[in-house]
Amino acid sequence: MDEQLKQSALDFHEFPVPGKIQVSPTKPLATQRDLALAYSPGVAAPCLEIEKDPLAAYKYTARGNLVAVVSNGTAVLGLGNIGALAGKPVMEGKGVLFKKFAGIDVFDIEVDELDPDKFINVVAALEPTFSGINLEDIKAPECFYIEQQLRERMNIPVFHDDQHGTAIISTAAILNGLRVVEKNLSDVRMVVSGAGAAAIACMNLLVALGMQKHNIVVCDSKGVIYKDREPNMAETKAAYAVEDDGKRTLDDVIDGADIFLGCSGPKVLTQEMVKKMARAPLILALANPEPEILPPLAKQVRDDAIICTGRSDYPNQVNNVLCFPFIFRGALDVGATAINEEMKLAAVHAIAELAHAEQSEVVASAYGDQDLSFGPEYIIPKPFDPRLIVKIAPAVAKAAMDSGVATRPIADFDAYIEKLSEFVYKTNLFMKPIFSQARKEPKRVVLAEGEETRVLHATQELVSLGLAKPILVGRPSVIEMRIQKLGLQIKAGVDFEIVNNESDPRFKEYWSEYYQLMKRRGITQEQAQRAVISNTTVIGAIMVHRGEADAMICGTIGEYHDHYRVVQPLFGYRDGVSTAGAMNALLLPSGNTFIADTYVNHDPSPEELAEITLMAAESVRRFGIEPRVALLSHSNFGSADCPSASKMRKTLELVKARAPELMIDGEMHGDAALVESIRNDRMPDSPLKGAANILVMPNMEAARISYNLLRVSSSEGVTVGPVLMGVAKPVHILTPIASVRRIVNMVALAVVEAQTEPL
């Protein structure tokens, strides 16, 4: 490790506070009553319930989502036997990966005990605390005995990740690699370098899937493992000992091998050995940090080889984070008493299948220009693929149920998968009523920037989720090329329509109609013709106007107001309103907050603010949320008398006259809007109850500043919008920072709006 990396790692672990984990309360502890409920005397109630029924612990404590990462530090990743305390940073790191990727809480438990039986007693005694045990960095052969004994003694999952995590990922890679080169698992010959925990577990899993044991040859530090090589050979090694045919070295047995599985050390496999392997060999060089052979060296002599390593700087990384968070997620969610072979095999197949799916936008962003389409350079998913949790955890949970180890079976798997999706997409629960309604009657939605990669990823999701009938504006050749490059599985003419923005035969009709609509707004025939040819937002808007599309999304490129100046004059305002407005939603840990007007009106009048407020309340109801509106000002219930405060008071009068049932109050400070006790100190009889969820600002500056400050200050917050309100057709203008998920969300909202449009 170079000095710069070393110092960066030390600083990372020391600042701003030592270590990588902490315990955070999930209940409020702000009052004496809170303390009485959390501890004495109130805590006695759940204790007595658990005494009567131990399963009640899953209802009243955090046990159901708590895993122990346990180690004695005898085989710490690449560092060897450094002891339990020195291995603590690794165990903390494992804990944060559980939390990051699967939302599982972890206590790291470092046990200073080398005697396997004493270690087993310590861990077994912890069963009341945890719902799962992840054994970590325990040397072989003791790790086999420890895991076996704990599995027999404990009634919760015990999983040695160094064995089974590596085995699950490697097996998935081998299955997919063989599929690429068109070989059968039952026919191939495999040579293994290393006979430790990971290697043994890999072989066991492959044999369970159909690899023939007689086609496996294992080499350890002493050479080929053959029968009667030595007295008292470990059972795990003896199980794979071959007949003695005189071959003693890796070089002797590699000739003609289809697969090399390396779980040993650096530079074990040479180029000369690789040359002797069978057609299209599969090489898993998993030693870290330096593999048995570097991929460039293997490729120099065998360009037909498919290569996996444990490193992130080469394709096909075998990384245990692809597995352990999600296999535990599935196990915990059904109250599994073990992680059995059926569950491991389910994880193997789920991981293997995900590599065949279309490319995820999150993965594409993380890995730049890498080709992530299934093939020699991509036979296993990337660790940051957000779909891992929704593919692996349900497969594992179902396998647990089918194999009889689930104590809390899942009744509704669709609902379970949807809940897991909320972990990936924070807007999922918020958007649920919109998605459900959109699926009932998908509408034609034109996406004006159809060549954009985010739009193409969004189109894939829209098609997969059945939310809309997308129409992409762009050059067909560019769209097709990018779909192929991105590894998407959508087809023009089948899943979506393309409008060629360079040569669509309808363009003469488009610009003629655009001219007729805009000729009294300073647009000449020549300008109309040029606009249709050069501006994809104009094309999309004309399509909606002509009834060739039901709704439109634009704005992933360019300035908001450039798009607004196209759509508003063309469509006008909807019936009954004389202005438009924009609203953004912030999904914060404290609750959902909507802010208006963030994009349209610089300094709206009271009449305009009243219309914006009423439209915002209507939009919020679409999400299944009852609006609670606060009109914000630097004045707090009449504390100041100035034009902006008067404007908000007048707005309140106008809104109450038109919607007396709406829960609204103002003008008020921001803290009074969000904290009821602060508001009640000033205005005890305020009709606004609880925290306001719609914040109407006096002008665009206040709205935009507030929105952006809240957006960046909350690391856990996500956004939806901008929602354009008041325009006569379902159209939404996004911003250049819009993510794929935000595009999907806004298309779904546009579909729902189009469903309720008058014919």
Where are the model-predicted features located?
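Adenosine-phosphate binding glycine-rich loop
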Residues: 157, 161-162, 181-184, 287-393, ...
